[in-house]
From Swiss-Prot:
<dbReference type="InterPro" id="IPR002376">
    <property type="entry name" value="Formyl_transf_N"/>
</dbReference>
<keyword id="KW-0808">Transferase</keyword>
<protein>
    <recommendedName>
        <fullName>Methionyl-tRNA formyltransferase</fullName>
        <ecNumber>2.1.2.9</ecNumber>
    </recommendedName>
</protein>
<dbReference type="InterPro" id="IPR005794">
    <property type="entry name" value="Fmt"/>
</dbReference>
<dbReference type="InterPro" id="IPR011034">
    <property type="entry name" value="Formyl_transferase-like_C_sf"/>
</dbReference>
<dbReference type="GO" id="GO:0004479">
    <property type="term" value="F:methionyl-tRNA formyltransferase activity"/>
</dbReference>
<feature type="binding site">
    <location>
        <begin position="109"/>
        <end position="112"/>
    </location>
    <ligand>
        <name>(6S)-5,6,7,8-tetrahydrofolate</name>
    </ligand>
</feature>
<dbReference type="InterPro" id="IPR001555">
    <property type="entry name" value="GART_AS"/>
</dbReference>
<comment type="similarity">
    <text>Belongs to the Fmt family.</text>
</comment>
<dbReference type="InterPro" id="IPR005793">
    <property type="entry name" value="Formyl_trans_C"/>
</dbReference>
<dbReference type="InterPro" id="IPR036477">
    <property type="entry name" value="Formyl_transf_N_sf"/>
</dbReference>
<dbReference type="GO" id="GO:0005829">
    <property type="term" value="C:cytosol"/>
</dbReference>
<dbReference type="InterPro" id="IPR041711">
    <property type="entry name" value="Met-tRNA-FMT_N"/>
</dbReference>
<dbReference type="Pfam" id="PF02911">
    <property type="entry name" value="Formyl_trans_C"/>
</dbReference>
<dbReference type="Pfam" id="PF00551">
    <property type="entry name" value="Formyl_trans_N"/>
</dbReference>
<keyword id="KW-0648">Protein biosynthesis</keyword>
<dbReference type="InterPro" id="IPR044135">
    <property type="entry name" value="Met-tRNA-FMT_C"/>
</dbReference>
Length: 312
């Protein structure tokens, strides 16, 4: 097939690799514009743009996608299908209906669960034990199109969104190649989504990372894993921001007496923090505002205290 690809971050590169291996003709890669990044705020090109340049594929980086300009440019390339993977923009009907096979999306969840911009993060943060990828025929709704193919993946106990994303990306590439093969053969029967089963994976905000110590320890740990690397998990210690970098539920430890957020040193292990329902979270690595990351025990030693309150 002649494919026009729309995608921006590293997650989308696995789909490009899969299309290339399957012998599809990539007529263009459409990515978001280069953006300032890092401390120096130097312009950084998207991962998909770097891939396209390395493979000799034309790159388009429009600021706007709904003024007809992009649709006209792609129409001139006569693609058989548009493939979309984490592009980060909402496409209008002119793009969705441009190619004979329409627009096909690689989505990082088992739709209709986790429709939206952050499916990987929310699946981990909500304690899912299984997620996966969906190859979907796009429509004008938010991830509401018909399902062409799905592949499931079991989450590991220590998965974060950062460790899960590359595995889902690879699985998505494999599923995409298979779906296109079946589509060309006329062997796919699209399946409508059940809206009653839908959940929303909204865009993450900084405040999502604030630890709610009144939640059970398992939920606090799941949120930490889901929100790694951004926005991370953070609390306060005597008015200073404290990032919680590593923690896990500790069923073998009694929760410190007092309100949720009460923390005490567990010799040789870390900080036991009281959470909701009488549960305990063992915090092992932290970063106090203005300091480098350190073990929770080193933090306690530096404060010369065995017990203190978090969230104050």
């Amino acid at each position: 097939m002649r494919i026009a690809f729309l995608g921006t971050p590293a997650f989308a590169v696995a789909a490009l690799d899969a299309l290339d291996r399957a012998g599809h003709a990539l007529v263009a890669v459409v990515a978001q514009p280069d953006r300032p990044a890092g401390r120096g705020q130097a312009l950084r090109e998207p991962a998909t743009k770097a891939w396209a340049r390395a493979h000799g594929v034309a790159v388009l980086q429009p600021e706007k996608v709904r003024d007809g300009t992009l649709a006209a440019a792609l129409r001139a390339l006569a693609p058989d299908a548009l493939v979309v993977a984490a592009y980060g923009r909402i496409l209008g009907k002119d793009l969705l209906t441009l190619a004979p096979h329409g627009a096909i999306n690689v989505h990082g969840s088992l739709l209709p669960r986790w429709r939206g911009a952050a499916p990987i993060q929310w699946a981990v943060a909500e304690g899912e034990r299984e997620t996966g990828v969906t190859i979907m025929q796009m429509d004008e709704g938010l991830d509401t199109g018909d399902i062409l193919l799905q592949r499931a993946l079991e989450l590991r106990e220590d998965d974060t969104s950062e460790t899960l994303a590359p595995r889902l990306a690879a699985l998505g590439g494999e599923a995409l190649a298979e779906a296109l093969r079946l589509l060309e053969a006329g062997a796919i029967v699209p399946v409508r989504q059940d809206p009653a089963q839908a959940t929303l994976a909204r865009i993450l905000e900084k405040e999502d990372g604030r630890v709610a110590w009144e939640s059970p320890a398992r939920r606090v740990a799941d949120r930490l894993r889901g929100f790694t690397p951004w926005p991370g998990a953070f609390t306060t210690l005597e008015g200073r921001t404290l990032k919680v970098l590593e923690a896990r539920p500790a069923a073998d430890l009694a929760a410190p007496a007092g309100e949720p957020g009460e923390a005490e040193v567990v010799a040789g292990r870390g900080l036991a923090v009281a959470c909701g329902g009488g549960t305990a979270l063992l915090v092992t690595r932290v970063q106090l505002e203005g300091r480098p990351a350190q073990s929770a025990l080193d933090l306690a030693n530096g404060l010369r205290r065995k017990r203190f309150r978090l969230g104050t």
